[in-house]
């Protein structure tokens, strides 16, 4: 749809939509214009707009859309400003009717109409000079107006009662979201007639910080109002209307009116108490029992200059209020947290306006939290003394040290910290303010902890604790003013240190005879800079059950700069993690992980003892893990075992070294990058353990300078030799007896783990070299192809040839390195096997079981077609050790009696024979291949030549079929397993039947064929051969070889005499 003037239509829509919904009328108007601009017909636009606007307007949607299209068609929005659309709500209609009839019935001065109506009307002009009317003049005006108002009062009371019963979901006639002038007028009217206070008009007009009347006060109150207070404000306005209407009634209604006002105040006080449940109450409402009513009245003292009395004189109004005397009023102003007290306030009872208040942002009457209102959250959470409302935000990162309040734990040695806490806190209202201190004394801000001198303000006494200090605002301008009701003090010396944990330092009593317990308790443990704790006298041991554990003579650790870590998680026990944590304490000269072969131990060495001592005494969890234990590392190899003590709570961790038990709250800070850099080494732990101590920094730097390959070789070649040294050094250093068998088992386990790690590293390097070699080969192949395509005179030919030469040299070098690595690894493995302890003598039953397992493994490997040479050698070795003959020899004794010895005897004499292949493999080596075309016979033959040497082949092109005889059984097995697929065609392969010669009287068939029929089929008769092959296809297929092997092994088991069957 094409619109003539979008701006005027938007203004018209804003006015129409404002009473219809709670959404922003201007934003909704823009949305409606965007819908209107769609290229649709009127019918489609109406349907779309009804669907889209239903969520905003609900039952008024259809009516609004019809009116909108009528206005667009008649161009009404261009000429006539739209009146708000009257809703169908009965409550709104009732309230509009009340306002209109009130305007028609009340025939009196504009002031009286203004006091009654809550409809939209311009606010009265403010008056600069407020003149307090005489009491007699007020009585005359009252008498002259009674006749005119008598008839209207009953109607006003009745209609006001109807307005009070409007449902909560109905839209009131006055919406606080509309304009600032409405807010000003409603706040002004509300404050004029709802509050009956003894405060003079001049003072009430001058105080703008209470957020009541006047343009400034109303705007401030509107800015700080939140959604939780909106329903309450609506109820207050309706209650104000009812209160004003009844304020003109006769004197016999005053007792009832007072009771109703009292009930409202009690309800407001209970609502305020419920609002601050489970939260810290604001400072001005600490004692709600005594001052809830006064605070209720004082919050509503407006700043409108038109605050003159209208009905009754001052005396009658003062009699009905719960106000205080001028002296108590001045005292309350003195304790108020959002006003500066003056000396004249408690001396002059006349209604003199106080000086302008100090302008700091948080002067809201409800003591709202400024951070919560402006930022949406407050980092103090439930510890904040200011109001967060009924739905506070829970800040999950409250334990973050960078967000916590700048305060430390309670310090009992702070001077005069409890001086002001003996009586009731200032501002509590339970007694007079404590006498002012001397000018030379100091006061402590209860929140920031600042120590500030007491000064006189405007010639009066010192500011109480609750009054904000401008110095505090200069220091922290974003914080709200301090609360008056904070009886707990803080350490004034801990302003700059973030609070980490509430750890209470426990002093250690001196062992010297002159040191008293009281003096030790007074002494504070300060941070040491460069002085070691060697100057501290010798401490006596505390009881054994103390949580601090026994003390250690600090003279032992005065030159120690190494810390030992235990129970470090394996994922965190790395040089990078440890360096990131300990670099903040000083310069690190060495980090050793997996100390003594323990993957959960580490050694961190600092450049000086002072740095190591600061790291040791830090209360911060190492790597954010409380289970990690930190001990002083003992350089001696067990010489001072008698002087070592175990640390309490060490978790059974062997040789734990003690240190000073001072508590030091180190400030976590970003570590400064070290100019020299940390010299870190990862030397061989077993080698250093064999020496019994950690290497010196020079030695460790030398180890760092060594190449990685040398360190790897050192780790692998000296693992076995240093194992005994590690065991010898570990036993005295641990301070506890070890079982020799358990110690040997643990050392062997550590050696195996280290060997696995070395092998994995070597395999990774070898794999990387192989990949590099393959990439070089590809590059060289590409270069050769490029050279072949080039002409002889091509200028690029010479550089390409040079590149090929370089690649060839690199490939040769890589091959040599790979071969050298393999030889080195093989030599290391042989050396480790030689260094291993001799195996325990196995019993005969164990040897038989192992022989059986090995034979089963041999059968399984043969079924899979894998190389079984190593397994056969191991099987033969086991048979020689057990004294039995091999399966092949047992079979040969049956087939060849000319050997002249029974199977058992031959087996026992076997170790005297020369080693080598002494048996004949008589298994079938010929296969029959079918399933191809006759013209493909030659190609199929070439295909099977890839699997080994073919000694004989026979081609029958009529069937067609191919009979192949391989030189070895292994080649035939490979052909059966891997030669089934040929050019996406599956060939059918089976073992050819074996032709046996004329049977001798004592001889038996060598092997049983896989075919189920007669085995006397001759190779010269191919038809019978094909028929036997077709009969055995069901058994052969893809699993031909394993099944044949199983049958062969079953025949072997039946024909030979096994050792375990005896």
Swiss-Prot record:
It is found in: Nucleus. A zinc finger (C3H1-type) spans 363-391. One of its GO terms (molecular function) is mRNA binding. It holds the Pfam family PWI. InterPro entries: Nucleotide-bd_a/b_plait_sf, PWI_dom, RBD_domain_sf, RBM26-like_RRM2, RBM26/27, Znf_CCCH. Residues 197-207, 823-840 have a biased composition (Low complexity). Negatively regulates Hedgehog (hh) protein signal in wing development. Regulates neural-specific glycosylation by binding to FucTA mRNA and facilitating its nuclear export in neural cells. This is Zinc finger protein swm. It comes from Drosophila melanogaster. The lineage of its organism: Eukaryota, Metazoa, Ecdysozoa, Arthropoda, Hexapoda.
